[in-house]
């Protein structure tokens, strides 16, 4: 029996979290969404239980308390997460950001799409890739 995939979304925008959740539901796949509202909460959650290993992490860059840059660096220090793909999921259009994160080990730099259909297609691609 396959276990449900776990996606961990780190984003301070409640609307973006709802849209992400809705897009996941539209994939018609068994995926559990866990979220944190800022980098500090995310790191605490990830360090609190070394059995919590999401299948994928999606990280916004522009957040209060602990921004995505610092959060990304902290995630990379957590040994039990070293094989978890980290997707930078952001509105930042800075090509230097994209290059920096990809060179630092991010799996992909993905711009938050304007349409939910684009997000559904993107997420379905990740899920389909996981199941093969």
Spans of features found by a protein language model:
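Non-catalytic signal-transmission and effector/linker regions of two-component phosphorelay proteins
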Residues: 1-8, 15-22, 112-132
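Two-component/phosphorelay signaling modules centered on CheY-like receiver
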Residues: 14-34, 38
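Helix N-cap/capping motif at the beta->alpha junctions
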Residues: 35-44, 68-71
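Conserved phosphotransfer cores of two-component systems
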Residues: 48-52, 76-83, 104
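Active-site residues of response regulator receiver
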Residues: 59-60
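Receiver (REC) domain active-site loop signature in two-component systems and cognate sites
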Residues: 63-66
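Alpha4 helix (beta4-alpha4-beta5 surface) of REC/receiver domains from two-component response regulators
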Residues: 70, 93-110, 118-121
